[in-house]
């Protein structure tokens, strides 16, 4: 199953993604994409699909794909 960002571009592992968040931003390289409830339970996230990445502050984050912008597809 593929997931798309808010512009409808496919998000792949290794892509750089961005989302505004609480007056700042989360930006990082996609480490994993969770699409099933089983994967979500294994990775400790809820309500798949989720895109997992480490942001610029080395914090592990999980976001809904529709909230993200794939910066690699913007170039």
Curated annotation (Swiss-Prot):
Disruption phenotype: Leads to abnormal metabolite levels including decreased levels of 2-ketoglutarate and increased levels of phosphoenolpyruvate. When in the presence of NADPH, increases virulence in a macrophage infection model. InterPro entries: Hva1_TUDOR (IPR021331). Induction: Repressed in models of infection. It comes from Cryptococcus neoformans var. grubii serotype A (strain H99 / ATCC 208821 / CBS 10515 / FGSC 9487) (Filobasidiella neoformans var. grubii). Residues 1-24, 40-75 are annotated as: Disordered. May play a role in primary metabolism. Residues 1-13 have a biased composition (Polar residues). This is Putative primary metabolism protein HVA1. It comes from the Eukaryota.
């Amino acid at each position: 199953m593929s997931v798309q960002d808010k512009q409808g571009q496919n998000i792949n592992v290794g892509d750089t993604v961005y989302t505004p968040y609480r007056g700042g931003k989360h930006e990082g390289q996609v480490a994993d994409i969770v699409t099933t409830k089983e994967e979500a339970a294994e990775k400790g996230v809820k309500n798949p699909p989720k895109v997992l990445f480490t942001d610029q502050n080395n914090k592990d984050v999980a976001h809904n794909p529709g909230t993200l912008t794939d910066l690699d597809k913007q170039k």
